[in-house]
Curated annotation (Swiss-Prot):
Cytoplasmic face residues: 1-33, 337-351
Membrane spanning residue stretches: 34-54, 316-336
Source organism: Homo sapiens
Primary residence: membrane
One Pfam family of this chain: CDC50
Name of the protein described by the UniProt record: Cell cycle control protein 50B
Amino acid sequence: MTWSATARGAHQPDNTAFTQQRLPAWQPLLSASIALPLFFCAGLAFIGLGLGLYYSSNGIKELEYDYTGDPGTGNCSVCAAAGQGRALPPPCSCAWYFSLPELFQGPVYLYYELTNFYQNNRRYGVSRDDAQLSGLPSALRHPVNECAPYQRSAAGLPIAPCGAIANSLFNDSFSLWHQRQPGGPYVEVPLDRSGIAWWTDYHVKFRNPPLVNGSLALAFQGTAPPPNWRRPVYELSPDPNNTGFINQDFVVWMRTAALPTFRKLYARIRQGNYSAGLPRGAYRVNITYNYPVRAFGGHKLLIFSSISWMGGKNPFLGIAYLVVGSLCILTGFVMLVVYIRYQDQDDDDEE
């Protein structure tokens, strides 16, 4: 069989330096004089960055309180005992009293922390309907199967929001009070609850369905709240810009954590007389205790924290840089010893 010139050249690449692999190239020769300085320079750079990150993290002030309510740990233990073994424990209130001997430098962020809570579980992580959370009316009425068993209520109504993540929404609440003078009255400290969610989540991923006759409640008519919720999603807040699927607390909770111990932002303290931080004095945190954690062996903590240019307190990144830098330096010394030892042997062989 004879091929024509046209057939032979039909699939040939262009005769260019790029397609014919004739581009100029350079391949470094990794000799000891090149590799050893690279290891030492990389190690010093990592150690320098690690020290900066570590000391920056250590400079962040934190004040934390475990209010799980284990027996004998404070007045929250009464609330924990009252809700033991119940899916929906009765509302209960407790308080945390503390004093600050000096200014707690701001801005101050208020977090809640949960332990032994695996939001990274595969079945838990996919138990949501992103189309429903984006406000699509069709998805509101027809949640995806991944939401099961929190897809439809016992009456057959679609659950909004559906899924295990939404059903386990953290629902404790806090208020902060300050006693400026010993024996004086407590004054409530304003907690800024706005802007605590990621901008892309609040403005892009989470949207409410279209209003019906100007009412969000009518838009959710024919749906049911998750089983563990005490009220429907459109009553999460009296603020129309912070209720429904765009409620800040809800949006923060729906961004799942990668580790079983995690923190989520609850509020910022940056208004009025507290814009520079928390002044010295006595404080009281009123806690509405709703969220049960003892059933799965977890703990819940309340944390006041300042921040730095790198964010909140996190020594892991600095330690990781220090470890990598130290390994680079150690590897460099090992390679240097090997090079010196075998270089002498090579010189003897050449002679």
